[in-house]
Amino acid sequence: MLKNHPKGLIVAFFTNMGERFGFYTMMAILVLFLQVKYGLDEKVAGDYYSWFYFAIYALSLLGGILADWKKQYKTVILYGQIIMFVGYVMMAIPSMSLYGTLGALLVISLGNGFFKGNLQAVVGQLYDDPKYAKFRDSAFMVFYMGINVGAFFAPFVATGIRNWWLETNGFIHDGSLPALCH
């Protein structure tokens, strides 16, 4: 399947798959986290979720402009990954205030903005070589499969982590309990 492709495709595949896995694991629990940790109602937590998504796509424009201006796509991608990592570490600080959490989300969205579109550009550049040009379409199919694989498994892992944590701390999660209340 990858026999006729440059080696950079497999790196891009796993990089994007890992990023999407981490991103969708967080997104699977973000609104619930905001509601439980900070007592936000559904609408306010949903608004923060929406603004976070908006920031990712708005800052992707900034990341693309920066990479085009500097002509250093891989460097911008690396900085994006580092910035996202810092944002995720900030999110992991347990005593953080709501403003700290929102700041962490902004840092994550900035890193994601530097990362998101530029990785696709690098994949396209791998196929500028005439030797690989005829494989460009299949390369993007493989590349986007990494996104789908990462996004598919993320909610299951988030649920598994939640269940493990509940059981480890002496709690039991029973999904049928809300139905018994009605």
Model-identified regions with their sequence ranges:
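Short amphipathic helix-loop junctions that connect adjacent transmembrane helices
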Residues: 26-44
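Cytosolic juxtamembrane N-terminal segment immediately preceding the first transmembrane helix
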Residues: 1-23, 99
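C-terminal ends and interior cores of transmembrane alpha-helices
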Residues: 79-102
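Central cavity-lining transmembrane alpha-helices of secondary-active solute carriers
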Residues: 50-68, 116
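Cytoplasmic membrane-interface "Motif A"-like loop-to-helix N-cap segments
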Residues: 69-82, 134
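Glycine-rich segments within core transmembrane alpha-helices of 12-TM secondary carriers
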Residues: 56, 135-163, 174-181
